[in-house]
Each structure stands twice: as C-alpha cells, then as structure tokens.
Amino acid sequence: MWVSHFLQLLARVLVGAYPRWVGSAPNHNQRIYIANHTSHIDTVAIWAALPEHLQKHTHTVAAWDYWANNKFKRWLTTNGLNAVYIKRSKEDANGEDPLQPLYDTLASGESLIIFPEGTRNKGEVPQPFKSGIYHLAKRFPHVEFIPVYLENLSRIMPKGEFWPVPLACTARFGKPFYLQEGEDKDDFLERARQGVISARAPHVASN
C-alpha cells in the first residue's frame, strides 16, 4: 500500500535505515526479529530495512493502548506497518492472554518484529528483556529468532525528541538462534539480549 512506501521513503530520507545482514540472510524463513528500542522511529527503520518480499509476511508488534487509541494511528500502523496489536493492561485484555494475537500470527506462518525491552531506552546497550519472547519461543520452537541492532537511532531521535538529528541509521541483522532444550526463561532472555548486543558493529563499545 502507498502508505507503507511513504513511511519507508520518509525513514530512508530522515535516518537512512540501511540494512546490514551480518549474521543471517534475507530469506523466507519464518522469523521473530528482536531489536533494541530507542525511539518512536525504530519500527519504521526495521521495516524499511527489510526487502519488500519479506514485508508482505512480517508484522510489527504494536501496543494497543498507544498505536490503536485513535483511528488515524490504527489506520497508519495497520496499513503502513502491517501491525498486530497487543493489549498490555488487564482491563484492555479482558482476562485474555495478551500474547494471543502474536500466537495467532505465528500459527498462520507469518513473522514478527518485536522490541523485547518493552519500553524505549536511552542507552546503547539494551535493558533486560521482558518474558514475552520466551513464551513465543516455547510455543513455536521451530521459528527463528533474528537479533537486530539499530545503530545510531538513540542519537538520531532520542527519547523525548520529536525531530531527528542528521545521522545515518544502520539495522544490523545478526545470527539466528532458537530456544534450546531445557533452557530456562532467564537464560534464554539473557542469551537473546546478548544476541542483539553481538549484532552491533565492532567499533561500538560495550557497557
């Protein structure tokens, strides 16, 4: 749809959104892309970095209370970013599993883009991950996890700012991984986090 092409063009003009497939290839394997989260433009940057043939079968995960709280936002994210929504509060979810829309999407053979930190982070190193991706991995152990490190977006459009600084963003796609047999939640979440950190360019210093 034209709105998707417009958002991608805007992302490329403003931040670059250059893809670097450093540990994986842009193939048709079903995947869950997990990335560090530093700004509102992160989702568009990853979306723009994916080839169009993968976008058709990939869905961005969006918070219902923020991205679907008015008709325009919902139209924009549904038609522009192929969004699937999760209801984070018990009141919105009406007692249902908030991950059910993601289970349904994966069960249909589609892929997801998700930010496991759950909130934006000012630092270059991701915060500890929320448990949602562990539950996805347990239910769909055959689905690849692809760590993605968004480089420079914390400086291009930091939390609290509304206009980007003119720097180039790179989306670095790292090595695929799966939930290992017998691996517990904490170990998996930390391994996933380290996968995102490892996808960074070598010159980026560790914390």
Question: What is the predicted function of each stretch?
Answer:
Residues A25, D42, A48, A68-N69, ...:
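N-terminal/domain-start segments enriched in small and hydrophobic, helix-friendly residues
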Residues A63-W67, G118, Y149-S154:
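Short beta-alpha junction loops
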Residues A17, K56-T58, E110, V143:
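A structural micro-motif
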Residues L14-P19, K90-L99:
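Glycine-rich, highly charged phosphate/nucleotide-binding loops
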Residues N27-K90:
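Catalytic core of membrane glycerolipid acyltransferases/transacylases, capturing the structured
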